[in-house]
UniProtKB/Swiss-Prot annotation:
Modified residues (Phosphothreonine): 113, 224
Record keywords: Cytoplasm, Hydrolase, Methylation, Nucleus, Phosphoprotein, Protein phosphatase
SMART domains: PP2Cc
Catalytic activity as recorded in UniProt: O-phospho-L-seryl-[protein] + H2O = L-seryl-[protein] + phosphate; O-phospho-L-threonyl-[protein] + H2O = L-threonyl-[protein] + phosphate
Effect listed in the UniProt record for changing residue 153 to L: Decreased enzymatic activity
Family named by the database record: Belongs to the PP2C family.
Domain of life: Eukaryota
Name of the protein described by the UniProt record: Protein phosphatase 1H
Amino acid sequence: MLTRVKSAVANFMGGIMAGSSGSEHGGGSCGGSDLPLRFPYGRPEFLGLSQDEVECSADHIARPILILKETRRLPWATGYAEVINAGKSTHNEDQASCEVLTVKKKAGAVTSTPNRNSSKRRSSLPNGEGLQLKENSESEGVSCHYWSLFDGHAGSGAAVVASRLLQHHITEQLQDIVDILKNSAVLPPTCLGEEPENTPANSRTLTRAASLRGGVGAPGSPSTPPTRFFTEKKIPHECLVIGALESAFKEMDLQIERERSSYNISGGCTALIVICLLGKLYVANAGDSRAIIIRNGEIIPMSSEFTPETERQRLQYLAFMQPHLLGNEFTHLEFPRRVQRKELGKKMLYRDFNMTGWAYKTIEDEDLKFPLIYGEGKKARVMATIGVTRGLGDHDLKVHDSNIYIKPFLSSAPEVRIYDLSKYDHGSDDVLILATDGLWDVLSNEEVAEAITQFLPNCDPDDPHRYTLAAQDLVMRARGVLKDRGWRISNDRLGSGDDISVYVIPLIHGNKLS
């Protein structure tokens, strides 16, 4: 085991998986190279690149920055720019997509408001094939804008698939609740098919006395809507959207798991998406990409990063509860450094799943095993293998030269944050920034905000390209300039050698939704 671990640790700088830098296949893949691709590799469709342009963009020496040719291809005059890595993988493993989603109630679906109409439905499951909208005699649905970024590792397969299909899973999940969301004055029913009460959302539940008396609206009352128990939780509409996004991420991950036996879907990916629905932004993140809002020069974080360090306690607790997942090769405990055999019987600082601080424990044989989480900062890895703990894919990922699967420690669940556009009057320089970790590895939130607040005021407010140029400026600042000692940014710091993808989304368009 020690030899295997040394080999894995030696590959820390080679990529997110030990021994897989630049590879199109994850460890232990099910013969993926002999299977057809689920979707062909390419760059985001909204860039409008020809095949020749795609090939030219994959220049690891020049690293040309790609931007939108036509701003009308993205809603809200959104800006976008990207650049390929400096050679760590053959392809740019980032993927992006942006669409306007139309959500209609499924035909024949149970609804909370009988006799309401819904007009379009999917003619197939969300597998990206045969997707069309069919007219019927039911009500109008709702439209929402969708932006997404996927940062692939150990190949671009999972990122490409997620960029094509996740939006369909989101639409599918929203279809069951679209009529409920449109009726914001009434709290969601506990069971679909119940007629909602015509009362404000803040006065749904009965008092205990009314419930016991059997009065109007009480259990057993002959003239009122379904029973409302006084202990029933009040679920706001926003929680339904959050649940839909969480379910969509889970279904996307399950689809990748199912289809990897039929298609070559390499590696895994992080996922950062935004939907604008009924005047609110919902930002869902699984991985280490990041979203921030810059409003009047103020920075508003809209995501958290999920890494071995930030999720240490969750990972340790899982390993503590299910020690077989460690394969008798790892310890779930954390120590300041590797424990040496000569330290048996001595007391050393350690940290367990229930601790944020440190304590001393007597070193035992079990503590000599390799730690579940090893390394610091960007070099921290789960089982010396992967540096992100949430995302999609990675179903075949194993510890280097072993049969220990890492997927049980990885989660597809996103964190979802909400921003209410209607609460603010946004200016033309107020923006939402979405970017993969290639940007954030070298630029802080403050540096990005400073760059935006310096750049946008110097652009014509009526120039539709201003946000694309701002995205290009951010990518250029993070990539830097190629010098004798590699890519360098300001103050001669090392530039980002990773793939970089950036959206700059102007929030002024949200004013129209208020």
